[in-house]
Amino acid sequence: MAPANLPSIFNATSTDIEQLLAAQCHVGSKNLGVNMQPYLWKTRADGVNVINIGKTWEKITLAARIIAAIDNPSDVCVISARPYGQRAVLKFAAHTGAQAIAGRFTPGSFTNYITRSFKEPRLIIVTDPRTDSQAIKEASYVNIPVIALCDTDSPTEYVDVAIPTNNKGRHSIGLVWWMLAREVLRLRGTIYNRETPWDVMPDLYFYRDPEAEAEEKVEEEKVPGVEEEGPVAIESGFPAGGADWEAAPAGFPAAATGEWSEAQPATWESGAAAATGPSTEWADSAPKDTAGW
């Protein structure tokens, strides 16, 4: 699997191969296109096609040399309609100076000069030839070279340089874009030599779920050591089991702080008699009229 068609200076290190394998860049799909057969390593028993990692590294270095040959970095346009590649293309553009189109590609961006999103790049790089087919189609109209991350079942029509890799996983997409950016910076001289490690981690290119990021932010903002005392403490800000702080109204006795059942009389009848005293019904006190009709 080691690349044999490269100069010795471009040979992959053991760390590079281990990273490609750890990110599952070698795991393809169960379908295999005719144009992707030269990049096939073998087919597993479950029908999954395995990509040759050596071929992947060869195409990464080839694509990096093509990108570095363009004088103006902004003449390179990186595109990703797939969500897993949008963060990667934005980081690639930030590190290399390219233009990024993350999300939906506006039709006519390469062909209709009246639109505000019109661009004239000298090279485009797409994450998936199937999801970014509109960009590849328009590039073919205006003779723009295309570099694409291709899986075993990806269409390669109008694709000039295909980088064989798993273009459906978040880790594999991010790692290939990270390696591509690192090789471009090495060729431009931004990274002094090949022995100098790049201070940017591959994790920066990986897709992150916005909901997971929001949950992590909430967890970080929580004050450690603060314990809640129940729903009353949460709603009012006061402890649930404290003493009575409210003064009794004028003319009424203060409420007892003990159990309410202790203050109740033994029976209802005795309590009612003690509370009301002698009967004060108006029917009993009114004089009776004895005169008849």
Swiss-Prot record:
SUPFAM superfamilies hit by this protein: Ribosomal protein S2
GO molecular function, one term: structural constituent of ribosome
Matching InterPro entries: Ribosomal_uS2, Ribosomal_uS2_CS, Ribosomal_uS2_euk, Ribosomal_uS2_euk/arc, Ribosomal_uS2_flav_dom_sf
Compositionally biased tracts (Low complexity): 247-256
GO biological process, alphabetically ordered: ribosomal small subunit assembly; translation
Assigned keywords, A-Z: Cytoplasm, Ribonucleoprotein, Ribosomal protein
Disordered as annotated region, ranges: 239-293
GO cellular component annotations of the record: cytosolic small ribosomal subunit
Tree of life domain: Eukaryota
Cell compartments where the protein resides: Cytoplasm
Function field: Required for the assembly and/or stability of the 40S ribosomal subunit. Required for the processing of the 20S rRNA-precursor to mature 18S rRNA in a late step of the maturation of 40S ribosomal subunits.
Subunit text: Component of the small ribosomal subunit. Mature ribosomes consist of a small (40S) and a large (60S) subunit. The 40S subunit contains about 33 different proteins and 1 molecule of RNA (18S). The 60S subunit contains about 49 different proteins and 3 molecules of RNA (25S, 5.8S and 5S). Interacts with RPS21.
Protein family membership: Belongs to the universal ribosomal protein uS2 family.
Protein name in the entry: Small ribosomal subunit protein uS2
Species, as recorded: Chaetomium globosum (strain ATCC 6205 / CBS 148.51 / DSM 1962 / NBRC 6347 / NRRL 1970) (Soil fungus)
Lineage: Eukaryota, Fungi, Dikarya, Ascomycota, Pezizomycotina
